[in-house]
Regions:
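Bacterial N-terminal signal peptides
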Residues: 5-15
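Terminal, non-catalytic domain-edge segments
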Residues: 21-41, 164-165, 269-423
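Low-complexity, Ser/Thr/Pro/Gly-enriched N-terminal "stalk/linker" regions
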Residues: 21-80, 109-110, 114-131, 167-171, ...
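Carbohydrate-binding/catalytic loop surfaces
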Residues: 45-76, 124-144, 192-212, 250-275, ...
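Non-membrane alpha-helical segments in proteins
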Residues: 73, 77, 83-97, 110, ...
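Aromatic- and histidine-enriched alpha-helix N-cap/loop-to-helix transition segments
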Residues: 76-90, 142-153, 204-215, 261-272, ...
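Aromatic- and glycine-enriched pocket-lining scaffold segments that form the walls
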Residues: 143-218
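Long, leucine/valine-rich, helix-dominated scaffolding and oligomerization segments
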Residues: 203-210, 222-292, 389-404
Length: 423
């Protein structure tokens, strides 16, 4: 009776209450506004962090060349351009297909332009830059698995839309082909843009590497139509690794550990395994992928309540956009391993200087990514049990008070919920 009276009052006032799904979409729209007003730079790349008024301090060409603060660009605002643009592009393609406005189309195009730039600025075949500095082309020497993998995912998803012209479609296909061929020549090792700064290997025997190589080769054969990629894809999936296991078994097992620090890149893997699951026609392989989705989701579910421990900064004193404050410590680096060791020492300083970002990294990011992992699974009971907590987290988030860009995963989460609800 109360609900009927409430709706009648709303009608009299000319205001209709939002349905459950509309509430989530409305919150995703708020996040979208925040991301595009503050976090997407002039080079169409997402910054890791910015101030509440859009303050950002970009590395200069001299600083990138000198590996300052480190050759990975960790803790700078251009640390994760390939990673973030690729995964956000997935959500923006979904958003566009849900609401085909010129504005949403343009957002997809801009993210694609950013990913193309990351391939263009380097001089080493197979290199995908993490981001670009103050001149729009300078960049750090090291890339990683986590920059390359979302690059494939994002551009592969883009080609499924009706956005690209025939010329743009062909250009994108050629870029994906060129990247695949370059990595294959390197035996699937991820190159840096200088010698000794290689970081990552897709033929490794851990879960993430197995998902990366399986998905990249799937994207390659779907977008190019070339049989050689299809053949390689299935050889790798059914083949054995150095530890004697088949890759399909490794993927089915899911990640050995699910923790707050790993949920963000493992959510990307869950999205990729779902692609493999939905597109596979071999019943045996489909069972392996279903097992992977299930195992990963079950391990992630306990991370969703992390958001309750998140405490937004009450003022602006908990953040500085100036990453220079973490120097010292600094030391020259000869390779990627030295760069990573230096970066971990620097993080201790940076986390003290910007505790607001550290709070978001530790509590909010893993909760959003874990929720997406669960939503991507085929486990109806698990999703049903998690939904009350997921809804509270989504509806309680105020993106206007956040500094660290990974709250964009809320859009990925809501778009997936919307698609699965309409099935």
């Amino acid at each position: 009776m109360f609900k009927q009276v409430f709706i009648l009052c709303c009608l009299c006032l000319g205001v209709l209450p939002l349905s459950g799904q509309e509430e989530l979409i409305h919150k995703a729209d708020e996040v979208n506004q925040t991301i595009w007003s503050r976090f997407i730079g002039k080079d169409n790349l997402m910054y890791d962090y910015v101030g509440l008024d859009g303050e950002v301090v970009l590395p200069t060409p001299e600083e990138c060349a000198a590996d300052r603060p480190n050759a990975l660009g960790w803790w700078t605002p251009i640390e994760n351009g390939g990673f973030f643009n690729g995964m956000y592009l997935v959500a923006q393609c979904d958003r566009y297909e849900r609401n085909k406005t010129p504005e949403n189309r343009e957002k997809v195009r801009r993210l694609v332009a950013g990913l193309c730039k990351l391939q263009d600025v380097g001089s080493t075949p197979g290199f995908i830059a993490r981001g670009v500095g103050s001149d729009g082309k300078c960049h750090y020497a090291a890339s990683s698995n986590d920059q390359n993998f979302p690059w494939f995912l994002g551009l592969g998803r883009y080609l499924e839309t009706d956005i690209p012209t025939s010329e743009e479609r062909q250009d994108c296909i050629e870029r994906i082909r060129r990247q695949g061929e370059a990595l294959q020549k390197l035996n699937w090792r991820i190159p840096g843009d200088r010698p000794n700064f290689e970081r990552g290997w897709w033929l490794g025997s851990e879960y993430t590497a197995c998902v990366h190589i399986a998905t990249a080769t799937r994207v390659l054969y779907e977008v190019t139509g070339e049989e050689k990629w299809k053949k390689l894809h299935y050889e790798l999936i059914r083949g054995r690794m150095s530890d004697g296991r088949e890759r399909k078994v490794c993927i089915a097992s899911g990640p050995m550990n699910m923790a707050g620090w790993s949920a963000w890149f493992l959510s990307n893997c869950q999205y990729a395994v779902r692609i493999l699951y939905l597109r596979e026609t071999d019943p045996e392989l489909k069972k392996y992928y279903a097992a992977s989705l299930r195992n990963t989701a079950r391990r992630a579910a306990s991370l969703i309540p992390y958001y309750k421990r998140f405490r937004p900064s009450p003022d602006r004193k908990g953040f500085t956009p100036d990453w220079h404050t973490m120097m010292p410590p600094f030391a020259p680096q000869k390779n990627g391993k030295e760069a990573a060791a230096l970066a971990m020492k620097q993080y201790e300083v940076w986390a003290r200087k910007s505790p607001a970002v550290a709070q978001e990294k530790v509590w909010l990011k893993p909760a959003l990514c874990a929720a997406w992992i669960v939503t991507l699974s085929e486990e109806a009971d698990l999703k049903r049990n998690a939904m009350p907590e997921i809804r509270r987290m989504i509806l309680g988030l105020d993106s206007t008070r956040l500094y660290y860009a990974t709250f964009f995963y809320l859009e990925n989460l809501v778009e997936t919920l919307n698609k699965t609800a309409s099935r």
